[in-house]
Structures are given as C-alpha cells and as structure tokens.
C-alpha cells in the first residue's frame, strides 16, 4: 500500500495448493510484508523484530525494503532500536548485520523493494541518461551477484522489484493524472536496465542453490481495463521482458471478481519468460483494512482474494502487512488510530487473518 479457498483454503503452512488446468498442481506461497510499520514491541532491531513476528505467524515468504534511495531508505523504514551503518551500495547494505540476520532466517522467499543509492526512487521520470542506464544495470548486477554468491547453498529465492509503478509513472497519487510519453519511455529503459543487471548476475554466477529474479510492480490495473487509461500494464510491461510482474491490488480489493480479472489482464500484457511461463504474475500487496470492515469481514475478503490468486496460479501472494503503516490520527496511540493494515495490532492482539497461515 502507500508509503503508502479452487474452493477451499488449506489452513496448513503458507504454501497453499490449488488445481490448475495448465498443470496438475500449482502452489501459491502466502507471504507478509514488513515495511514502514509505526510501532514495535521489543528492543530487537526493527527489521528483524518484524521478520521474527512474520515467522511466528507461519509465513515462509517476506517482503521488505532493501534500499538506499533518497525517499524511503531502509534506515527510515526500519528505525526502531536500530543503528544503521553508512553504506554506499545495495550489496553493501545487503551485507550489513541486520540484513545478514534477516537472510539467515528460515524464509524460502525474500521480495525486496530496491532502488539505486542516492537518487529518488522515480528520478528517471524527469531525466534518464545513458549514464543512469549503465549505473542501474551495474547496481543490480552487483546486488544480484552478491545474493547468488552469499546464499548459494541455501535454495533461497530473492525477487527484486520496484514499488507501485503506476504512481511512479505519474509522479503523484492522482489516478487521473496522465503520464508523459517521455516518462513512459524512460520507465521502459529503466526497468530494462535493472532486468539486464539481474540477468547478467545469473549468467555470471551460473547454476546454484539460490535464485534471483526481477519484477515490475503495477497498481492501477482496473482503470486501464475499463477506461483504457494509461498504465504500466499496457504501456510498459509489453516492452520489457521482466522475470515477473507484481500486482499491488488495492484498486480491486472490494471485488474478488475484478481482482481475478486484473490478474488476467496483467498476464495478457506481460511477456512470458522462464522459469515462470504462464505463472509470471504474483500479488505484491493485498488485504483489507479493519478500519473499513469488521475483523471477520476483513478475514473473509482477504481469504476470497487469496482464493482467486491461487486459482489463477500466482506463485506468491503477499499480505499487507505485519504492522500497520497508516495512521488515522496523530499521534497514533491505540488500535482505532490506525487504518488496520495489520496481522499484529498495536495492542499486541492478532488479526483473524493470521489463521490463513495456521498449521
């Protein structure tokens, strides 16, 4: 969100099996995001406090930020009980004690919001030079190679992605804003450079236990479908052979039917790439805030959306999130002062949605 059961759900672990027409079985790994939460419970560094809570709930996939951009660097998003060292590269950031501790945890998949150091996350919208293009490729080749080498014997998967590309393309949170043709062209080049870097890292490392992929995240999908509005899905994705496409699914959270249609729409526009093939679209963010519904309704809607992601064959579906990051009152003090994007509330109680991860 902003920075900002295929008929039954098997309540057993975070990998949920569904039948597929294209192959006999496909598994959707249910994950949890931990990005920019507003409260904490322990004196553990915040990145790993949240990760430990995600593990306790039963998830084997976690989405975090690993970034040095000037908008939302990791030090800003994980501030509690943390002393972040000064580093200049993403591979150096990944090698800090906090991230080494995180990556040593028993998660199968790490989804990483990552941006090049020292620049705004969407700086390319205003200007994207040949030098920038080269720097992006080198940055992500270096990060990818570091992850592959460091975790070669672990069988862990790392997915490096942007965040909500349709907002980045517009430069604002107004869905009616029209992106410029120059911004669209720059985004294509920017994503292609990141993908080249990750592809280079894989080629240089060769085969091994760990896997690294690159994803493009989209978020304004429904309006592109029904209004033919400009979008990353229709105007960018067809032109870049990214490994995966991520859907931050807030525009269809009220309708499982529209959510399923959006997944199909994204897949229609994404180039099929190996090893995911027809299953190259995952849900990068989804859920239902408790401020808009009873806890029971929020659970039921989240379960319905998850069922559609399973039915479609998404490899991952990431619930937003472990701790809420959006206040409704300042300063937030009690549960009702937050929008309710959580698995753990500020008072320490658990959301019913945790049952989706229960053994």
List the model feature ranges, each with a label.
Residues 6-15:
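Bacterial N-terminal signal peptides
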Residues 157-163, 185-229, 276-287, 317-322:
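Aromatic-lined carbohydrate-recognition surfaces of secreted/lumenal glycan-active proteins
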Residues 29-34, 60-66, 109-113, 159-162, ...:
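Structural recognition of the beta-strand scaffold that forms the well-ordered cores
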Residues 46-50, 90-100, 220-236, 260-272, ...:
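Alpha-helical scaffolding within the catalytic cores
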Residues 233-294:
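Glycoside hydrolase catalytic-domain groove-lining segments
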Residues 17-21:
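Boundary at the C-terminal end of the N-terminal hydrophobic targeting segment
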Residues 42, 74-92, 102, 106, ...:
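Aromatic-rich peripheral "rim/lid" segments of glycoside hydrolase catalytic domains that contact
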């Amino acid at each position: 969100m902003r920075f900002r059961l295929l008929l039954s759900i098997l309540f057993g672990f975070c990998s949920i099996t569904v039948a597929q027409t294209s192959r006999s079985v496909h598994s959707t790994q249910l994950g949890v995001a931990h990005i920019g939460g507003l409260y904490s419970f322990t004196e553990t560094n915040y990145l790993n406090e949240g990760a430990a809570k995600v593990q306790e709930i039963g998830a084997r996939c976690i989405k975090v930020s690993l970034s040095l951009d000037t908008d939302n660097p990791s030090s800003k998003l994980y501030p509690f009980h943390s002393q972040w060292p000064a580093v200049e590269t993403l591979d150096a950031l990944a090698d800090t004690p906090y991230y080494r501790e995180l990556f040593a945890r028993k998660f199968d998949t790490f989804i990483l919001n990552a941006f090049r150091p020292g620049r705004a996350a969407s700086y390319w919208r205003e200007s994207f030079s040949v030098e920038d293009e080269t720097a992006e490729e080198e940055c992500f080749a270096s990060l990818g190679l570091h992850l592959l080498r460091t975790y070669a014997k672990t069988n862990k998967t790392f997915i490096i992605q942007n965040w909500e590309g349709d907002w980045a393309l517009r430069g604002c949170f107004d869905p009616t804003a029209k992106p410029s043709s120059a911004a669209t062209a720059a985004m294509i080049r920017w994503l292609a450079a990141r993908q080249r870097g990750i592809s280079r890292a894989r080629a240089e490392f060769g085969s091994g236990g760990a896997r690294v992929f690159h994803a493009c995240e989209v978020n304004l999908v429904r309006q592109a479908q029904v209004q033919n509005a400009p979008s990353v899905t229709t105007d960018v994705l067809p032109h870049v052979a990214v490994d995966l496409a991520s859907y931050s699914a807030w525009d269809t959270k009220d309708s499982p039917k529209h959510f399923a249609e959006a997944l199909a729409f994204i897949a229609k526009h994404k180039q099929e790439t190996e090893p995911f093939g027809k299953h190259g679209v995952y849900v990068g963010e989804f859920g239902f805030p408790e401020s808009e519904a009873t806890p029971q309704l929020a659970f039921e809607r989240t379960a319905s959306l998850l069922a559609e992601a399973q039915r479609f064959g998404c490899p991952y579906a990431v619930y937003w999130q472990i701790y809420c990051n959006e206040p409704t009152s300042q300063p937030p003090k009690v549960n009702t002062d937050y929008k309710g994007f959580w698995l753990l509330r500020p008072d320490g109680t658990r959301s019913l949605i945790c049952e989706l991860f229960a053994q």
